[in-house]
Amino acid sequence: MHELSYATSVLNAILDAVKQQEELGRKVIKVNDINLEIGDLTLLSVDQLQFVFEVISEDTVCKGAELKAEIVKPKIFCMDCEFEGNLDTKDELEVACPKCESRNVKLKGGKEFNIVNATIEFDDEE
C-alpha cells in the first residue's frame, strides 16, 4: 500500500505550511480540504489515500480534511509518426501509438503527485 507514503508526504507538507503560517503570527484552526493532482500512472487509489490520511492526521489540524483529487491522464508522443495525444491506460505495459501502433513512444505526464492548494481556517477570519 504505497498510499501510506503519499499520505504521509501530504500531511508533512501541509503541517509545514501550517507551521510557517503560525510563525507569521496566524493561528490555524483547521485544514478543511486539500486539492491534489494525481497522475493516472501512479496507480493510487484516492479512496485508500483518503482513508490512510484520515488515520494519520487524527491528532493534527488536518483531522477531518477532505482530499480532493484531479486525475491527470498521461499523454503519448510517437517518435515515428509524431502523433501526440492521450494514452489509454487500460494496460500500461502495452504502450503503443494509437495512430500507427509503433512502440517507439515517449510518455508525457501521468506520474504527477502534486498538492495544488489547501483550504485552511484561521482564528483571525470571521
From Swiss-Prot:
This is Hydrogenase maturation factor HypA. Signal peptide: none annotated. Involved in the maturation of [NiFe] hydrogenases. Required for nickel insertion into the metal center of the hydrogenase. Pfam families: HypA (PF01155). GO terms for biological process: protein maturation; protein modification process. Belongs to the HypA/HybF family. Ni(2+) binds at H2.
